[in-house]
Curated annotation (Swiss-Prot):
Protein name: Chaperonin GroEL
Molecular function GO labels: ATP binding; ATP-dependent protein folding chaperone; isomerase activity; unfolded protein binding
Family to which this protein belongs: Belongs to the chaperonin (HSP60) family.
Keyword terms: ATP-binding, Chaperone, Cytoplasm, Isomerase, Nucleotide-binding
Entry's EC annotation: 5.6.1.7
HAMAP family documented for this protein: CH60 (MF_00600)
UniProt xrefs under Gene3D superfamilies: GroEL (3.50.7.10), GroEL-like equatorial domain (1.10.560.10), TCP-1-like chaperonin intermediate domain (3.30.260.10)
One Gene Ontology biological process: protein refolding
Species of the source: Bacteroides fragilis (strain ATCC 25285 / DSM 2151 / CCUG 4856 / JCM 11019 / LMG 10263 / NCTC 9343 / Onslow / VPI 2553 / EN-2)
Length: 545
């Protein structure tokens, strides 16, 4: 495929047009009075959103050079969203500002490499300032509610729901988002450990109305192989039955012959028993069975540990206050495992979460941690139409991820104030040469831009507000929602420190790459020849024998 090449100022100018096209579409969504963006869909209703990364992901430009520039900034938005869960619009605004200021200086003859070094030095100082400004959230659910409210586009209902969900399942708990059947947004909480495996036979059901098998204080047998020979199973089945307590069997599988025997015994002798398949697959299954054992105070009967099924004793069985098994799920409530063992297991999983680089593995580990530490909350998002539903789910997702970021690194004053306060940390900073010092000045100017844009979206004059906020101290800032200058923490206008930090780091990283770019290579568009028209009079082949 043939390529086209552009160099120097010409290349950077084309890239900047793409940067501006994307950034201008994204930045209208910033702040409490940010506007909506409507995205046309080929099928179904258009998507209305105020989520920066959703807007960014939809943008593809026809000009290849400009599209390359747009994709650079799209990377800023999506990476910030992945790392911190929010701050995608802020990152885009910062990237555009750094690129615009930097490009002026590079065009005037400054050294791009020195400017980049100056930018990197300034960003490191600002990040330190943000970390010093950060205030830990701890168990203060009012602060958690404030963060969630701001990230959900100042929707106090969503903020309260997320704070309530965290109260119920703890800060480590899993909170998932699903679509509600009606228009109300509500919380559902699954207490205890739930895994997605149901009963192996409907004959195990004890509550025919709900089609569930309900067990009070059952023994729980945890086996990592298939039960195919009932003879091996009898030594543990008999004492469990004699105790008069129900028995839940969790195994890789149960052979049809063994299952039939269990069902017949269940029906004839009112033996309270239920069999379910073990959750997960491969190594993850082994870990999940170990989790269940720790939670219930039992032992995984595994040949890897030198334990065979026929050697199992009643002391090896786990137990819990209640177990409910439906067609699709098994829920274990109040397992009898020792608290210190559960805590130790949770700490192991937290260490694995910190070490893993795979997003999928991290998600699965967090699910396991939540199931051990408290339970799972489900936010059922309700709306009047499909369009509103998508927009609301975006906001709930933003708020939830921002809240997790706040718990991780604390909160700072919102509304762009944290960046304004960080400018002081750059006052004494000098580069090794004039161009490095210019790079520092670029960051000084660029970190005012989020506040300017929030104010502009609220219909006010940015320069005036930036000046007034700069003259203030501490958490003093401009609340665009109420059009009042006040203490941002007291007003509940707060941002997660992690979001503020990551947005700037990612913006500066891409802007630095942009400014040090000297050549752009794109694929040359081939002019496709038009399809030839069919010759007239070729409609049929009449007269042929």
């Amino acid at each position: 495929m043939a390529k086209e090449i552009l160099f120097n100022i010409e290349a950077r100018d084309q890239l900047k047009k793409g940067v501006d096209a994307l950034a201008n579409a994204v930045k209208v969504t910033l702040g409490p009075k940010g506007r909506n963006v409507i995205i046309e869909k080929k099928f179904g209703a258009p998507h209305i959103t105020k989520d920066g990364v959703t807007v960014a992901k939809e943008i593809e430009l026809t000009d290849a050079y400009q599209n390359t520039g747009a994709q650079l900034v799209k990377e800023v938005a999506s990476k910030t969203g992945d790392d911190a869960g929010d701050g995608t619009t802020t990152a885009t605004v910062l990237a555009q500002a750094i690129i615009a200021e930097g490009l002026k200086n590079v065009t005037a003859g400054a050294s791009p490499m020195d400017i980049k070094r100056g930018i990197d030095k300034a960003v490191a100082k600002v990040v330190d300032s943000i970390k010093h400004q950060a205030e830990k959230v701890g168990d203060n659910y009012d602060k958690i509610e404030q963060v969630a409210t701001v990230s959900a586009n100042n929707d106090p209902v969503i903020g309260k729901l997320i704070a309530d969900a965290m109260r119920k399942v703890s800060k480590d708990g899993v909170i998932t988002i699903e679509e509600a059947k009606g228009t109300d947004t509500t919380i559902g909480v699954v207490e205890g450990m739930q895994f997605d495996r149901g009963y192996l036979s409907a004959y195990f059901v004890t509550n025919t109305e709900k089609m569930e098998c309900e067990m009070e204080k059952p023994y729980i047998l945890i086996y990592d192989k298939k039960i195919s020979n009932l003879k091996d199973f009898l030594p543990i089945l008999e004492p469990a039955v004699q105790s008069g307590r129900p028995l839940l069997v969790i195994a890789e599988d149960v052979d049809s012959e063994a299952l039939t025997t269990l069902v017949v015994n269940r029906l004839r002798s009112q033996l309270k028993i239920c069999a379910v398949k073990a959750p997960g697959f491969g190594d993850r299954r082994k870990e999940m069975l170990e989790d269940i054992a720790v939670l219930t105070g039992g032992v995984v009967i595994s040949e890897e540990k030198g334990l065979k099924l026929e050697q199992a004793t009643i002391e090896m069985l786990g137990t819990a206050d209640k177990v409910t098994v439906s067609k699709d799920n098994t829920t274990i409530v109040n397992g009898a495992g020792a608290k210190e063992n559960i805590k130790e297991r949770c700490d192991q999983i937290k260490a694995q979460i910190a070490a893993t680089k795979s997003d999928y593995d991290r998600e699965k580990l967090q699910e396991r941690l939540a199931k051990l530490s408290g339970g799972v909350a489900v936010l059922y998002v309700g709306a009047a139409s499909e369009v509103e539903m998508k927009e609301k789910k975006d906001r709930v997702d933003d708020a939830l991820r921002a809240t997790r970021a706040a718990i991780e690194e604390g909160i700072v004053a919102g509304g762009g104030v944290a960046y304004i306060r960080a400018i002081e940390s750059l006052d004494g900073l000098k580069g090794e040469n004039d161009d490095e010092t210019t790079g520092i000045a670029i960051i000084k100017r660029a970190i005012e831009e989020p506040l300017r844009q929030i104010v502009a979206n609220a219909g006010k004059e940015g320069a005036v507000v930036v000046q007034k906020v700069s003259e203030g101290k501490g958490d003093f800032g401009y609340n665009a929602r109420t059009d009042v200058y006040e203490n941002m923490h007291a007003a509940g206008v707060v941002d997660p420190a992690k979001v503020t930090r990551v947005a700037l780091e990612n913006a500066a990283s891409i802007a630095g790459m942009f400014l040090t770019t000297e050549c752009v290579i794109v694929e040359k568009k081939e002019d496709k020849p038009e399809m030839p028209m069919g010759a007239p009079g070729m409609g049929g082949m009449g007269g042929m024998m």
